[in-house]
Amino acid sequence: TPKDVISEGDEIWIAMAKEKIDYEPIEMDLHILYEDDDLLIVDKPAGVTVNSKDQVSLANGVAYYFKENGIKRKVRFLNRLDRDTTGCIVIAKSGLAQSLYQQQMDDNTFEKWYMAKVEGIVKADEDSLVLPMERSADGIHYEVNPKGKETRTDYSVLCRHSSQPVDNSVNKSQNSVDMSQENVDIELQNVDKHGANVDKSVHNSSKCGYTEVLVRLYTGKTHQIRVAFSHIGHPLVGDTLYGAQPTGQPFQLRAQKVVFTHMRTGERITVTA
């Protein structure tokens, strides 16, 4: 109670109020990448929305998982991905976890990394795209506009390919997280451009080949990566909404990794999809 006197070294337990699950629980095959008492991180497949109210979404599958595992909490997403974007989706298990990890996102200590395939050959090995963006007049897509909110998208080129008709597979990457490895903060310049996570396949594109890039997102505007690369003349492969040639496949964007500081232990955690 407010009248209780506490001393240094005392252990205090806080009972979190039970909450009603706010989405209809629907059984779904979730690929869980990481879980602790405060967070759940899953690998979102292509073709599924995160939390649409008018159709079955990932939120329904998470609600079912919570129900089956006795997690009496609302589903709180800390990030969003477009329907056809795959990879790391982060869910907080409490309001406290949501608040603390959202603060990390706001100050960019919660890192969000993506892998993308873009049309054409990107000349710069790396760059930081700082652009103002807002929703366009049609209400469907977003655009670079001086009146918009400033965004920052950093990228580093992983590999460049000339045009050859081969398979696509960024969204078919092997999903894994090795929790036994030392968690490290990987900077753009330290990326192994020939490592196992780099997709070597080639896409159909009427433009001169395509480029594979590693992207770090510093802000979270809707369609930010798609708009940024379209603005510099290299839309994501297959992203017809933003000017790419049709390929018959979803656009190529994967939320490849998140890096954050554990809210209880202070340990730096890396989770890879």
Regions found by a protein language model. Name each.
Residues T1-A273:
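RNA pseudouridine synthases
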